[in-house]
A protein has these predicted regions:
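Conserved glycine-rich FAD pyrophosphate-binding loop
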Residues: 17, 67, 82-87, 91-93, ...
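Glycine-rich N-terminal segment of FAD-binding domains in flavoprotein oxidoreductases
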Residues: 25-132, 148
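C-terminal substrate-binding/cap subdomain adjacent to the FAD-binding core in PCMH-type
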Residues: 146, 165-331
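Short, acidic, Ser/Thr-enriched surface-loop or helix-capping motifs
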Residues: 103, 140, 171-172
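Extended, non-globular alpha-helical segments
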Residues: 3-33
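Short, hydrophobic/aliphatic alpha-helical segments
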Residues: 54-67, 121-135, 175-191, 393-400
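Structural signature of FAD isoalloxazine-binding scaffolds in flavoprotein oxidoreductases
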Residues: 47-50, 78-99, 153-173, 200-204, ...
Length: 456
């Protein structure tokens, strides 16, 4: 976009909206990258809307002139999903209000820029909590609803998007729509997990649940991968734990490197002293019970021990996160152990996360998962320095392709570098429907362009 065109865009938007409109170079620079730090796109203008009406005005203007618009919360995407090249960035973090905590309805209503840490603080004050929290409390509610929102409790409750009751959405034509599973269900079901491709959320209604006052965590250690995989399945399938947090980590072993596993089994209770560890852990094949930890559930949910992370200069994050059919989990992990060098994951500090779940816990068209009754979300999260970035990216792409080949499906909020054949494989028989919904609600393709390669 030329300087004259940018000036005209800036002038027009300042007349249209009541929020802030800026093209200050230092502001544009902050919005030119996301958390992944790999993709760079330079916006022409950043808009910080005052309310949903401002979002409507911006999108209607952009639709009439075919100007791209990207919606952005905390910018935690890794493939440029929240970036735009010479278009408009809508900074939704400024729409951060929590409108209501409704104990009787067991729900909360908020704007998209509210942080999950803020929601947890407000809801636990009334003895309620969201069913699922991701491992990072500083993500925005709108951001995880656009991506997926998977966490340690997903084996019981599904993704965060499975627990959304209703949305207010601005479509790609600038229409403000109230939607849920009964009203405009196509819009509702595709905006959730849709990475901003079908509409922009301006208000979210989400479930809450009541919780017991204490959490007990059993921390189990494993040396044998087969036992680690089998116990994850058993816990997700039969034990009904409130949360399962499983990790694999490289450990030095002389000149070699071996992998060890840890499973944290989290159980809510009225009285930790009344819990029978032998009953909860019977039939499992761990090598050691490393520790048993009791704490208030409100503190456990607050995740206050997790620091807020900003990328350091020269750091890049091409994370590969995929849902795998359970029958392929152990062979895939064994392949990762042989192909992923220790340095690619940050040495012994690097983790592979495994989240076991039944297939039935999620039923969302934009959250594609394998067909088997049991599955696992596998998260490989390297931190790469610039000299090693091309090698790490190539490795993550190979692992991504390997996961698709065995029936896996990718999490779209992370490093996803697909051509159209891969997009068709990702969505399978849902691909034609997804294209129809895109054409209906964003006919000019102005919303977050450049990520999903839709049919022409």
């Amino acid at each position: 976009m030329t300087g004259m065109a940018t000036s005209g865009l800036l002038t027009d938007l300042r007349h249209l909206v009541e929020g802030e409109v800026t093209a200050a170079p230092e502001v544009l620079e902050r919005y030119a990258q996301d958390f992944g730090r790999i993709i760079r796109k330079s916006p022409a203008v950043v808009v910080r809307p005052r309310d949903a009406s401002d979002v409507v005005r911006v999108v209607r203007y952009a639709h009439s002139r075919e100007v791209p618009v990207s919606s952005r919360g905390m910018g935690h995407s890794q493939r440029g999903q929240s970036l735009t090249d010479q278009g408009i960035v809508l900074d939704l973090r400024v729409l951060g209000g929590i409108d209501a905590i409704a104990p009787e309805a067991e729900a909360f209503v908020c704007q998209p820029g509210a942080l999950w840490s803020e929601v947890v603080a407000a809801s636990t004050a009334q003895g309620l909590a969201p069913p699922v929290l991701t491992g990072y409390p500083y993500a925005s509610v709108g951001g995880t609803h656009a991506a997926c929102g998977w966490g340690t409790a997903s084996g019981r409750y599904g993704a965060q998007i499975d627990n959304c009751d209703a949305l207010e959405v601005v479509t790609g034509t600038g229409d403000l729509v109230q939607c849920d599973r009964e009203r405009s269900p196509d819009l509702f079901l595709h905006v959730l997990g849709g990475m901003g491709q079908f509409g922009i959320m301006t208000r979210i209604r989400h479930k809450l649940r009541r919780y017991l006052p204490q959490v007990r965590r059993y921390v189990l250690e494993y040396e044998d991968l087969g036992a680690f995989v089998a116990d994850n399945r058993s816990l997700a399938e039969h034990h009904h734990a409130d949360a399962i947090d499983s990790t694999l980590q490289q450990k030095p072993d002389g000149a070699a490197v071996r992998w060890g596993g840890t499973i944290q089994v989290c159980v809510e209770t009225d009285d930790p002293g009344a819990l029978d560890a032998a009953r909860w852990l019977s039939g499992l094949h761990f090598d050691r019970l490393r520790e048993t930890v009791d704490e208030p559930t409100s503190r456990f949910l607050a995740q206050a021990h997790i620091p807020e992370k900003s990328p350091l200069p020269g750091e890049f994050f091409p994370w590969m996160v995929t849902f795998l059919p359970w029958s392929r989990l152990q062979p895939f992990l064994e392949m990762c152990f042989s192909r992923v060098p220790p340095a690619a994951l940050g040495g012994t500090q690097g983790l592979i996360h495994v989240y076991p779940a039944r297939r039935s816990v999620t039923q969302m068209p934009m959250l594609q998962v394998p067909d088997e009754p049991m599955m696992a979300l596998l998260s490989i999260c390297p931190t790469a320095r610039e000299p090693a970035l091309p090698v790490v990216m190539a490795l993550m792409s190979k692992l991504s392709d390997a996961s698709l080949e065995v029936g896996g499906r990718r999490h779209l909020g992370t490093w996803v570098h697909f051509d159209q054949p891969r997009w068709r494989l990702q969505f399978g028989e849902d691909w034609p429907r997804i294209n129809q919904v895109k054409r209906r609600f964003d006919p000019k393709g102005i919303l977050n362009p450049g990520f999903i390669d839709f049919d022409a």
